[in-house]
Amino acid sequence: MAEEKQTPRMKTHYFEVVRKTLQEKFNYKNVMQIPRVDKIVINMGIGEATADSKKPSIAAEDLGLITGQKAVVTRARNSIATFKVREGMPLGAKVTLRKDRMFEFLDRLVTIALPRVRDFRGLNPKSFDGRGNFAMGIKEHIVFPEINYDKVDQIWGMDIIVCTTAKTDDEARELLRAFNFPFRS
């Protein structure tokens, strides 16, 4: 017998709580106008990649463990002599999450990873791009429980971009606040 697929907690939270909250606050005429999280892009830029070309693939493995999806090694688009970078040289890794994996990552980010960040005082509410997308950085990838601290040879940071269908930053801020993102007041 096929096993029943479990719906991610944040997805259920979105459909049962977040949509109603946003509908009441912004008075949308149609349910399709209610903003939603479209995708999450996680990027790791490895500065030491110029010295050791194996580091981006190690970062891609770690990113794969964190997200549950295979990461893509990113390469330099053009050569920059100042940074000793050649065209096509591996420089980092990235993952684009959508649908259920996106909601599961969002859940782990908000409930587990962010509280484990050292000296965390909340997310900057001004980190929106003007089109409803939110960008943040984490200095240590070891805050995620999937990474075994003893087996890590180097600690890397990562950029996390949450893309939403919101038209304004205020709508996106309320959407993420409804997902329990810990914004600074």
UniProtKB/Swiss-Prot annotation:
GO terms for biological process: translation. Keywords: Ribonucleoprotein, Ribosomal protein, RNA-binding, rRNA-binding, tRNA-binding. It comes from the Bacteria. The keyword Ribonucleoprotein applies. GO terms for cellular component: ribonucleoprotein complex; ribosome. One of its GO terms (molecular function) is rRNA binding. Pfam families: Ribosomal_L5, Ribosomal_L5_C. Transmembrane segments: none annotated. Signal peptide: none annotated. NCBIfam families: PRK00010.1. This is one of the proteins that bind and probably mediate the attachment of the 5S RNA into the large ribosomal subunit, where it forms part of the central protuberance. In the 70S ribosome it contacts protein S13 of the 30S subunit (bridge B1b), connecting the 2 subunits; this bridge is implicated in subunit movement. Contacts the P site tRNA; the 5S rRNA and some of its associated proteins might help stabilize positioning of ribosome-bound tRNAs. Belongs to the universal ribosomal protein uL5 family. Part of the 50S ribosomal subunit; part of the 5S rRNA/L5/L18/L25 subcomplex. Contacts the 5S rRNA and the P site tRNA. Forms a bridge to the 30S subunit in the 70S ribosome. HAMAP family: Ribosomal_uL5_B. This is Large ribosomal subunit protein uL5. It comes from Bartonella henselae (strain ATCC 49882 / DSM 28221 / CCUG 30454 / Houston 1) (Rochalimaea henselae).
